[in-house]
């Protein structure tokens, strides 16, 4: 009986990419530990010493919801996702528009990115990223023969991207706009779009991004602060200068878990956008390197899964897996770049680690989709229909 139970357990584990699963488990675990460490001071100040675990418990609840939805998501075949993705995408865009409606949208730190449900705030842009990946993957898989045509293949998806981008910029959420644009462009490139059209659009987008920065006072202020945070360390460069101080204090091995000084009201958003800075201070270069390697490994696995799906003839699944990998990779890269002073502040969370209900829920659903693709790949290799 014990032998049979062990064999059954091995068969279950063989149905999943264990390297992907463990990289996700480790990142989620590190996130929980660091959120608790980074948020103790602010939780005590806001809610009292007896509620120091407030943000940890809240994030744990978000994670539990995300894992539950991920479990449900895993049961849905990819053919069903492809069949209904257009409707899901339209709903997510509608929610993105509702954010801008007075009385429905909820403003935080000068940006109207949330819909308040009293108990929680939902950030539709996080789910738009997921469904934009699926919509673009479905579009490219259906329109593969027309991708070299500007009017038939390229223009329709560009119009859709423009509508989503316009709504994101109205919030404003420049970081999400950049990520969504990068996702669509990457999926088009992987789908085999004409190189001439692709390069032309990259040029147009680069000019557009440059103009968007120049036309916005607050974006220009962020760029100026990024160029030299020490020129105004108590004003525009305050957040970045303290993030860099946190990295400097961490050195090789950090000051020890829980020993961060910057999280004590010096570094704003320590448990959200700038969690990596607290991690760098407490765990040092070694801790940051470990997190980066886990992200690299996770992204590599998504591409391996996507490549196998392509070999098995499922273009939609292949593009979804690789698109989600690019989403996580681009957003992680931007967040890390901001924390290290390599990129201007964008307001993006670190996937799987930072505090945030919508972010962690969308991440869990996205990773469940990848696990579903991997599971379907393995079933097809065994000659089974899915």
UniProtKB/Swiss-Prot annotation:
Pfam families: FTSW_RODA_SPOVE (PF01098)
Membrane topology: Multi-pass membrane protein
Name of the protein this chain belongs to: Probable peptidoglycan glycosyltransferase FtsW
Main EC class the enzyme belongs to: transferase
Predominant location category: membrane
Annotated keywords: Cell cycle, Cell division, Cell inner membrane, Cell membrane, Cell shape, Cell wall biogenesis/degradation, Glycosyltransferase, Membrane, Peptidoglycan synthesis, Transferase, Transmembrane, Transmembrane helix
Organism lineage string: Bacteria, Pseudomonadati, Pseudomonadota, Betaproteobacteria, Nitrosomonadales
InterPro entries the UniProt entry points to: FtsW (IPR013437), FtsW/RodA (IPR001182)
Species for this entry: Nitrosomonas sp. (strain Is79A3)
Database matches in PANTHER family: CELL CYCLE PROTEIN, PEPTIDOGLYCAN GLYCOSYLTRANSFERASE FTSW-RELATED
Compartments where found: Cell inner membrane
Family assignment from sequence similarity: Belongs to the SEDS family. FtsW subfamily.
Encoding gene per record: ftsW
Gene Ontology annotations for the cellular component aspect, listed alphabetically: cell division site; plasma membrane
Disulfide bonds: none
Transmembrane segments: 20-40, 61-81, 85-105, 114-134, 150-170, 187-207, 279-299, 318-338, 350-370
